[in-house]
Amino acid sequence: MKTTILITYVIATISLPISPLRASELSDAIEADYGRLDALFRHFHANPELSLQEFETSERLATELEALGFEVRRNINETGLVGTLRNGDGPSLVIRADMDGLPVREDSGLEYASTVMQVNKEGIEMPVMHACGHDMHVTTLIGVAKQLANNKDKWQGTVHLVGQPAEEELGGAKGMVADGLYEKIGRPDFALALHVIAKYPAGKIIISDGLVYSSADTVRITVRGVATHGAAPHRGKDPVVIGAQIVLALQSIVTREVSPMEPALITVGAFRGGTAPNVIADHAQLDITVRANTERTRHYLLEAIERVAVQTARAAGVSEDRLPIVDISPNGSPTTTNDAGLARRVSSAVSAGMGEDALLEWYQSDMGAEDFPDLVNIDPPIPSVYFEVGGTPPELIESGTWGPHHSPLFKIDSETSIKAGVEAMTLATMELLGRS
């Protein structure tokens, strides 16, 4: 009789559904944890680190995850890490946060503003700032980790929390995959990531069911001329003049070769050439960023840039052995595009948990890019959702006085955006790993 009762109890227990985490419970738990998260955010903001130099950030993240019961693997692509929490059978999920700062001198006015100086990979000492919100991303990841660790009766499966280096250089995700990330943790069933966005009101959640960000490629053109005296230009080939002609000709690719209905961008961000006013140098360099919303346009732009550079030099009489050298960085990244079905599931979960008014419609106002696709575009691709969290008080948006990303003036409403980010990401995780 006792055996029968025990078996019946076990069967009944196994068949009971996992009770969902009520919205009020989650928001109250995040509120109770915010003092800790605020201290972490201030620490990360005041101590930014350049790409692939995120040693202290990575170690602090690892320590926080280990304290919550996560198994942490360090040193994936130098400073990358992954913290794993297993909770029975079920799907596996990657949640990624990027960690690096930018070579920007902070002028935000925050009492915990960065005064950090770091030597970059060229050996130059630079000011460093979290001018894109990656401090918020790491803090949010830690907040999500606590909610998952404290509510293991509400989900099942495996969660891998990834601290990724070098997003700003568009090589960190690719480097982690190349360094064996998925050999270490296995191929996940889903992947999620978020980004705080200054153009949206703080606390709002924005989820696209398709395109999120453009592709990005970096191109360097080395224009080679023939050096001569500045008073005798006819005896040489002036790479500065040829470079200037190339700069202008590149703009015609976008305006005259690509459909006006297709977004495309070629920006020459740097032009270096010459050493003195009376010297015509033997070379000049152009550094270019290239953006597109489709792979077809992306490849067309890259091919067209090389064609324009070479043919412009030929038209100037440059010999075949001195034609421009066009280098395309291997750290380019494709478009960030959400899985439509997964995005709808995440949107529904966020709407149900945070209210319909928490969601805003996605729109594209610029051609920003991300390297998250390099984390998920393996063979076969991992279904993924990348969503945005508003970061600026509405009154600052209305007055136009907010600091844009990568600006010395950049700052967010950290409390509102972190709480919203933790709640939305936890709800998304419960949706993908929960059981009805």
What is each model feature region?
Residues 5-17:
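Bacterial N-terminal signal peptides
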Residues 18-23:
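Sec/Tat signal peptide C-region and signal peptidase I cleavage site
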Residues 244-436:
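Metal-dependent amide/peptide-bond hydrolase catalytic core
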Residues 31-35, 48-59, 131, 135, ...:
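Soluble non-cytosolic domains of exported or imported proteins
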Residues 44, 83, 95, 134, ...:
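Divalent metal-coordination and catalytic microenvironments
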Residues 82, 117-129, 135-136, 147-271, ...:
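Histidine/acidic-residue-rich, glycine-tolerant segments that coordinate divalent metal ions
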